[in-house]
Amino acid sequence: TDADWHPSGYAELFHVLWRASAARIPLSDADAELVEPLTAWLVQEGRRLSALELLGGLAAARAFERRTIADFSAFDAVLTPALAQPPQPIGSYAGHSPERTFAMQVEYAPYSSFVNVAGLPAVTIPVTTDAEGHPVSVQLVGRPGGEATLLEVAAQLEARRGPLPHPPAWDA
């Protein structure tokens, strides 16, 4: 069964929360060059947030949490992809502005972030491999306190799947 779930406004609240969280990193302007440009940018952007923006983001997160829990309540578990894209090569984010790098990473892994914001339990299970031998995984999202159910369903998926082949690189 498909869940009738539409996370409107999620991207905006996530950006506020992520920047606000980064603002707490004890990083001086002089030391900004010692960290990744993305980290320095997030810290700087987070420190620019107003109290009103932060409170708005926190209120939106609470509303998102309540709405997501309510929308998923009819299900013992909700199945999502683990990632929105295939594995990216090392260095694929290099050469982009910090803002673009952040957007690319959000687009790459949107499913785990919404689960974290909603405070729901989740487990990721590799279900197959791609042509290069990279694992392809799904994520099971459960109800609040539903960890035992998730582990039971994950064990059933793993048993049905059988052993995964090891990556070709292991033979090199």
List where the protein language model places each region.
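Short helix-loop capping/hinge segments that flank enzyme active sites or metal/cofactor-binding pockets
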Residues: V16-I69, P81, Q85, T124-V127, ...
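Short glycine-/acidic-enriched loop or helix-start segments at secondary-structure transitions
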Residues: Y10, P86-G91, H134, L150
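Small-aliphatic-rich amphipathic alpha-helix that forms the alpha element of a beta-alpha
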Residues: I69, R100-P126
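Structural helix-boundary/capping segments
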Residues: L55, A59, R66, N116-A172
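Acidic-enriched catalytic cores of C-N bond-cleaving enzymes acting on peptides and small amides
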Residues: T1-W5
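Basic phosphate/pyrophosphate-binding loop/patch that engages nucleotide-derived ligands
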Residues: F72
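Short, Asp-centered acidic motifs that coordinate Mg2+ and/or phosphate
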Residues: D76-A77
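Short, surface-exposed loop/helix-turn segments at secondary-structure junctions
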Residues: F14-L17, G56, Q88-A109
